[in-house]
């Protein structure tokens, strides 16, 4: 075979593969996602009754009010920033990631003692691991059921709700292990707090 014929065959093969891999396959996956999993494919957004986006079940938010179940600490403040002073362009690019400090690192210990422990103790909360340590991405939307239950007394007092009602709410909003064996049970903080707002004081 001549060089020209071999080169032509290689070019045609590359073009066909490019069309399949860069055009057909991506559009096929987009179509499948929009038809079969439209909610997940569009970011698992949570909206209120007016259609206003409140957040995503996949990305955590910095809940810190005593009226709500608090989120895990985040080294990136859940990729939020002041729109008027966003020097790091967080709102344009988004950031994630933990501090990568070892459990014995003095800087981490100081942060936990000075910030998280003081805040939790002031609120009368027994600290759990996920209430003082960040997740690997610093964007985790979940806390453990134990971390949620540790906050029941504070929220019950502030909202004048019976603790047992909050315990039931936590149980109702706890995600079990995937397929019953993978991962650990978790509570999505955004969904839990939205359900909390629907409760009425007794």
From Swiss-Prot:
It is a single-pass membrane protein. One of its GO terms (cellular component) is plasma membrane. Keywords: ATP-binding, Cell inner membrane, Cell membrane, Ion transport, Membrane, Nucleotide-binding, Potassium, Potassium transport, Transmembrane, Transmembrane helix, Transport. InterPro entries: KdpC (IPR003820). The keyword Chaperone does not apply. It is found in: Cell inner membrane. Pfam families: KdpC. The keyword Cell membrane applies. The chain crosses the membrane at residues 17-37. One of its GO terms (molecular function) is ATP binding. Part of the high-affinity ATP-driven potassium transport (or Kdp) system, which catalyzes the hydrolysis of ATP coupled with the electrogenic transport of potassium into the cytoplasm. This subunit acts as a catalytic chaperone that increases the ATP-binding affinity of the ATP-hydrolyzing subunit KdpB by the formation of a transient KdpB/KdpC/ATP ternary complex. Belongs to the KdpC family. The system is composed of three essential subunits: KdpA, KdpB and KdpC. This is Potassium-transporting ATPase KdpC subunit 1. It comes from Nostoc sp. (strain PCC 7120 / SAG 25.82 / UTEX 2576).
